[in-house]
Amino acid sequence: MKKLALLLAALGVMSATTFAAESALRITNVGQEVEIENESGGSNIGESVYFGTSVGLAYKDWTFGVIGAKRWNVDTDDVDSVTGRVVLDAWKHYDNYKLGFRFRSEKDYDRYYARGAWNHGMFWGSADLWYEAKSGKDVKGNDKNDTWRGEIFPIGVQYNGIKLGWFVDAEIVSGSVADGYREQNFEHQLRLYAPLYKGEKLTLTTQIRHTLTVDDKFNKENVSKESRYEDFGRTRVYLESDYKVNEALNVYLKYGYEFREKEYVANGKSDENKNYFGDLIFGWNYKF
């Protein structure tokens, strides 16, 4: 009887310890990332050079993320600080879908996101919807316009690691817009994700984004100095590599190149000044 009592007590301690461990907020991963975006006609190195540190956490069926970052405009002759960035994420996970919230703050705006994603058999989808509250003045000295934005995959299909999704990028500007500036934009794309190689440590994948249609509206198009993407006017291709250093640590490198055709809003003539875009991303991630 005494042995049984001791065994039950030991099981009780183990169960309590396990429950406490599962119930505690824990760190799941940490990482750092550099992203360099460069457009033809811009800075020699990158108009947007981003460096960020991220921490992932989990609590029961919730996951959280915290990102602190800095962004610069980098030329061979000069480095200009552009903005800092703070991002807070929270996700509630269910059987085959999840719902979340994101707050993102930079020097010139704050964003408030509602997020969702689902995955069921061969089908999947996701949506990031946000309100962007801007600060500062526009070109005419008026307060900058807030915007409603959305990046949505209404539906996608997947099979053996290959994913194909219909993507919608939507923007609606709140309030009156200065002459020549965009009031709204809806861009439809097809996006393909596919594995290329998988070894013991090295994995190679690709991502292809192809624009189908662009439907936008400008206030007084005839005076606009902006340019827009033509229908079927851009294709971006990423080559992505991930190397598993050990069970916990991986490093990655990605490069994207965008082929584009743009036209001036006012007269429909081709914009040859911005026909190139490159995106270089590299970083590391450590899982606990």
Model-derived regions, located:
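Extracellular loop and loop/strand-boundary signature of outer-membrane beta-barrel proteins
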Residues: 39-41, 137-144, 174-181, 220-228, ...
